[in-house]
Structure formats: C-alpha cells, structure tokens
Regions:
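Extended, low-polarity transmembrane helix blocks
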Residues: 1-20, 63-124
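N-terminal first-folded block
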Residues: 3-48
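Active-site-proximal flexible loops/turns
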Residues: 27, 59, 90
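Membrane-interface junctions
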Residues: 40-41, 60-63
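Short hydrophobic/aromatic segments of transmembrane alpha-helices and their interfaces
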Residues: 48-50, 103
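Hydrophobic, membrane-inserted alpha-helices
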Residues: 50-58
C-alpha cells in the first residue's frame, strides 16, 4: 500500500484516539454513562484512556507502528463488543456515531497492522 496513505491512516487513527481522551480523563457524563453501563467506571475509563494514549503514541513511530495498530485493533474490538452486547449501537441518542467510529477505527487499524506485518518480530 502507498506509504502516504498509510501515514494518513496512522495520523487519522491517532487523532481519533487522542480526541476521545479528554472525555475519558475529565469524566464527561457520556463517558461515565458508558463505563458505568459496562461496569468499568471509573478505573476502566482511566485504564482504557491510558491504553489509547499509548497506542496513539506508538502509531507515530515507524518501529512501533505495528504495536500501536495491534493495540488499537484490540481496543476497538472491545468497544465494538460492548456496543453489540451491553450498550447498543446507539448510545444516548448519538445516532450510532461512537459505534461507527469504533468500527472505522478498527478497520483502518487492521489495514495498518496488515501493512506492518513484516515488522512484527514474532511473525517474521
């Protein structure tokens, strides 16, 4: 895949992850509601936020891109799971925005991970 497209994907995923941090760390009511519903408030909210911060940072460095993409894939798979099991696709009348953002971020992180597969030490 084109290196420029992959760079744009990495930046896009990192921005998506980073922009959600203020909601998690500052205790936005929607974020508190989500993590209360799944039984992970407040420690899950802070923990997931911290993991998303690490994943977004790893995406910015070429050597660690695969780790950031792998973490993001796992984090978004968890978000998708909770949307499909406990939260529902639409949370607090958001029209499914959070769910669809999670699915899109998951798909893009899979593309990044696939493109970086040769850099993964335990696969190569």
């Amino acid at each position: 895949m084109n290196k420029t497209v992959l760079l744009i994907f990495r930046i896009l995923v990192a921005i998506i992850l980073l922009q959600t941090l203020r909601y998690k760390f500052l205790g936005h009511p929607d974020s508190v509601y989500i993590f209360s519903t799944i039984g992970m408030e407040p420690y899950g909210r802070y923990g997931i936020g911290f993991l998303e911060l690490i994943a977004s940072g790893l995406l910015f460095f070429k050597r660690s891109t695969w780790m950031g993409a792998l973490m993001t894939t796992g984090l978004m798979a968890g978000a998708i799971f909770f949307h499909l099991s406990q939260l529902g696709i639409e949370v607090k009348n958001d029209g499914g925005t959070l769910f669809y953002m999670a699915v899109g971020t998951w798909a893009i992180s899979l593309i990044i991970l696939w493109s970086e597969r040769k850099n993964i030490p335990f696969i190569n």
